[in-house]
Amino acid sequence: MIKEKLTIILLYITKFCMRFIYFFIKVFTKQKNKITLLSRQSDRLSIDYILLKKELEKIDGIEIKVMCKKIPSSFLGKVKYCFYLIKRMYHISTSKVCIVDGYNIEICVLKHKKNMKIIQIWHALGAIKKFGYQVIGKEEGSNKKIAQIMNMHANYDCITCASNATKEIFSEAFNTDKSKIQILGMPRLDYILGFGGEIDNKIKLLLDEYEFLKNKKTILYAPTFRKNTKMDLKELINSVDKEKYNLIIRLHPLDDSNVPEEFLIDNKYSTLDLIKFSDYVITDYSAIAFETAALNKQLYFFLYDWEQYVNTRGLNIDLFEVFKSSTTKNINEILKTIENNSYNYEELKKFREKYIETLDLNNTKRIINYVRECLEKNN
């Protein structure tokens, strides 16, 4: 209780200091014809940002600033990040459009210039598990008071998604009116569906580096991140017939569970690359299910902790209902379906048609067109 009170006091002080500094930054800076892309998901550009930046560079007369940096775990790292935030605040103040792919404190708690537009493209194509305002007060969710202090997911002018079904979910998760959510899609869809041939080149490099992958079909296991829980991978590893299948394990970046080296692929190959390459994808509550469905790959859900996860987090999609034949608590049932080649593609098709309406290779283009509209209104 004391720790929570101290945290709340510290957050109020942080918020006040940021607003105080930002007030003077706004006073002494002018907006430029600038677009700033912000992220704290990673220290490097996501494929969504790479594709957006590439298209934005084709627009004459605009400046593009990209700032991607995770919040460090160390105390000294956090102190340095505070100074880095001031730099981000400057670029926000001098921009006409800001694009984000997750919660960013400087976007949500500050009061921005009226004509500056903020576009949230989120870092997931859809949401099987609940998040944001859907899980406030739950074990895996945010503290209600802290979410209120930090203005969680405030100030967005537009939130992009890939379907009407996802629009309903995002409206709850971001606590916003559906009119602010637009079905523009996500750039990553253009990438995995082969626009420009970039992913095919990546797969070729993968096979050149890991030649043993050429000889057998590949099973990819990519679960979601679980707070305060290390994954036990022994059952999965022992159950897969290594004589017949390659097994690749790709954990969430925040998951530090131990994975034997033989099942790992270098992180220069993204999870999207691995989905594209693999023949079968096993996940649980991860949003990679949507990319897998977009590629019409065999998709399986290994839900060994179903009851616990529903209670601590909650789900937007009842997987046992939607994927009756490929959702199970028993890994051997999945492997049996793979072995018998008896996958139900009709269930996958219904899921894809409901949750992904933007399979036309124009996702990046639609978002860029929206950015253009924002710039034109500001000129």
Mark where each language-model region is.
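C-terminal alpha-helical cap of glycosyltransferases
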Residues: 360-379
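Catalytic binding pocket for nucleotide-activated donors in carbohydrate/polymer assembly enzymes
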Residues: 255, 260-261, 287-355
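A short, charged/proline- and glycine-enriched loop
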Residues: 27-36, 115, 214-217, 244
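Active-site and donor-binding regions of nucleotide-sugar-utilizing enzymes
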Residues: 34-196
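Helix N-cap/beta->alpha junction signal
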Residues: 102, 162-165, 253, 285, ...
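Membrane-proximal basic amphipathic "stem/tether" segments
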Residues: 1-42, 79-83
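Conserved catalytic-core segment of nucleotide-activated headgroup transferases in glycan assembly
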Residues: 44-55, 173, 181-260, 328, ...
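A donor-sugar binding/catalytic signature common to diverse glycosyltransferases
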Residues: 98-105, 109-112, 117-122, 267-313
